[in-house]
């Protein structure tokens, strides 16, 4: 079976003593997770936090945008290029998934709004309530 080419757009490069020195970076965590389930992927990490993005959207079969302690509400040096890349993925129907910062970046790039949480940020599951539903959001569930 041919491996799926997965491009990981890393937007976190934590070098703090508390986190960065004790845990693997996001790209390694995702590779470890996916490889523990089934080794069907060939990985390429793009250090998007350092302005690195694929030269051609078709370099990979699918893309994943990592999490980050950064906020999409701030303008980072890589933000506009990342949003343009997300819009290209959307218009060309290229599979794309985002986690944490990544899903927020996808929302902003596609016209959504990200607001500061009233309860500070957290790690883990959080209940989400939708105000309106789109046809692709099936079945409708809160």
Residue ranges of each PLM-predicted region?
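Short loop/helix-cap segments at secondary-structure boundaries that form the rim of catalytic
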Residues: 53-59, 105-107, 138
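Catalytic nucleophile loop
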Residues: 89-110
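Conserved catalytic-core motifs of eukaryotic protein kinase domains, centered on the activation segment
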Residues: 74-76, 108, 118
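N-terminal beta1-alpha1 cap of cysteine-dependent amidohydrolase-like domains
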Residues: 1-77, 81, 90-92
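Pocket-forming structural segment of enzyme catalytic cores
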Residues: 110-142
């Amino acid at each position: 079976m041919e491996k799926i080419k997965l491009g990981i757009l890393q937007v976190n490069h934590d070098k703090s003593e508390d986190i960065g020195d004790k845990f693997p970076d996001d790209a390694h965590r995702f590779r470890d997770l996916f490889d523990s389930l089934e080794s069907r992927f060939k990985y390429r990490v793009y250090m998007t936090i350092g302005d690195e993005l694929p030269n051609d959207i078709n370099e990979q079969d699918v893309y994943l945008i990592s999490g980050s302690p950064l906020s999409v509400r701030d303008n980072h040096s890589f933000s506009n290029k990342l949003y343009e890349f997300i819009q290209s993925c959307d218009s060309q129907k290229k599979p794309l998934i985002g986690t944490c910062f990544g899903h927020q970046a996808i929302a902003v790039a596609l016209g959504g709004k990200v607001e500061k949480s009233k309860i500070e940020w957290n790690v883990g599951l959080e209940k989400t309530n939708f105000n309106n539903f789109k046809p692709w959001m099936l079945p409708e569930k809160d």
